[in-house]
Amino acid sequence: MASRGVNKVILVGNLGQDPEVRYMPNGGAVANITLATSESWRDKQTGEQKEKTEWHRVVLFGKLAEVAGEYLRKGSQVYIEGALQTRKWQDQSGQERYTTEVVVNVGGTMQMLGGRQGGGAPAGGGAAPQDGGAQGGWGQPQQPQGGNQFSGGQASRPAQPAPAAPQGGNEPPMDFDDDIPF
């Protein structure tokens, strides 16, 4: 079987600014985000710690774009799976320009990482997408790749906020005195 190649990009990084969401004439949402990924190393000659940050343009379509616009903010950590795509366009002076982006549509994935910014419920009384409505997935069996994941342009939102009654003993203890190793 002859392979035609593989075009798959996986990124884990932080948003450099709030998502920019637009709607196409057909009503479909498009979100543009800039994602920063960093690597650090120690210079062998000087022993100095060095760091390099790369900025990636990411374009999300459909439900993924709507979810990104509603729940992602500058600094949010996110896992992205998409395809690399270069497009040609003309600037205001008529000069041809090229832009390379990671495109996340039907076959791609976006997964929100880290906790909610600011803690507590989101402003406006809405419910953030959660695993079955349980906070952070506690009290529910874990999904294979974790929670808050949206794949293939399909994002499900709970119909109601999480129930107020505590769930059957699966919630972790709230011991905040432990030292966190990171």
Curated annotation (Swiss-Prot):
Disulphide connectivity of cysteines: none
Listed Gene3D superfamilies: Nucleic acid-binding proteins
Cited CDD domains: SSB_OBF
Location of the SSB domain: 6-111
Location of the region described as Disordered in the Swiss-Prot/TrEMBL record: 113-182
Cited PANTHER family: SINGLE-STRANDED DNA-BINDING PROTEIN (PTHR10302:SF27)
Protein name from the UniProt record: Single-stranded DNA-binding protein
Organism for this UniProt entry: Yersinia pestis
Gene: ssb
